[in-house]
Amino acid sequence: MTYSEAGFQIVLTGNVVEFSGKLEKSSYEKVDEFLRNIDQTVSAPMCILDLRQLLFLNSSGIRSLATFMLGSPKQFELRINPEITWQKESIPTLTYLKPNAICLAA
């Protein structure tokens, strides 16, 4: 499953969701819908969100990720690139939303 727009792409392979490019939209309705479809499609109890190739994500995008994870019964592993400052500083706070269900991997 793939969702893409100019400048970014989200690809589901198995239970791994890879984000790439720059996600800086003002409206995330289509992204939110795609994430909901992923939640219904992935049968594994663990979903890996690979953000290592995501160069930018604005606050609305972070909210979309948070809403997706909070609304899902799955466990999540967030893979980040510690070389990208916004990922290193912003993404770890998402683990506080569901401490027993969201973990961080670099």
Indicate where each model-derived feature is located.
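Short, glycine-/small-residue-enriched flexible loop/hinge segments at domain edges that mediate gating
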Residues: I38-S59, R79
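A generic secondary-structure signal
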Residues: F34-I38, T67-F68
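Amphipathic, Lys/Arg-enriched alpha-helical "gate/interface" segment within cytosolic domains
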Residues: S64-M69, P73-A106
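Residues at alpha-helix caps and immediate loop-helix transition turns in enzyme cores, especially N-
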Residues: K30-V31, G61, S90
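STAS-typified acidic loop motif
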Residues: M1-L35
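Structural motif
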Residues: S20-K22, L51-R52, N81-P82
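Short, solvent-exposed loop/turn at the beta-strand->alpha-helix junction
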Residues: K25-S26, L55-S59, T85-W86
